[in-house]
A protein has these predicted regions:
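C-terminal and inter-domain tail/linker signature
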Residues: 1-123
């Protein structure tokens, strides 16, 4: 299983079943990230809370690997808000320590078009 697949599977289980065992397996105990909106440093527990609050409003496409090295991974995905036609493109850059995620940074950009048009997937 690739690191992108492991990341995807872990967070998908968390979204569907609210089970974080796979998330806990792939994250380093010293994990820290800076919230992209608040600029505040957060730990994994805070990331889990935010994820659960947001995911019920979003439809996510599968993550696609953009770039990968020994200690980093960059993935891209599209999101759509369930309640309205707001589309986003997001990139997450992940760094690893001892084979586990130690930091991640996500950057999103609102799109003025539906990225599913002309693709082999839809919402």
């Amino acid at each position: 299983m690739t690191r992108t697949e492991a990341f995807e599977m872990a967070w998908k289980l968390a979204a569907k079943e609210k089970i974080f065992s796979l998330v806990d397996e792939i994250y380093h105990p010293d994990y820290k990230a800076v919230g992209s909106i608040t600029g505040i440093e957060v730990n994994l527990a805070a990331d889990k809370e935010v994820y659960l609050a947001l995911i019920e409003h979003l439809i996510l496409t599968p993550a696609k690997t953009v770039d990968e090295g020994k200690d980093f991974l960059r993935i891209e995905r599209y999101t759509k808000y369930r309640e309205t036609d707001i589309f986003m493109s997001g990139t997450t850059t992940i760094t690893y320590k001892d084979g586990k995620i130690i930091t991640q940074e996500s950057v999103g950009e609102e799109l003025d078009y539906d990225p599913s048009e002309g693709q082999d997937w839809n919402w």
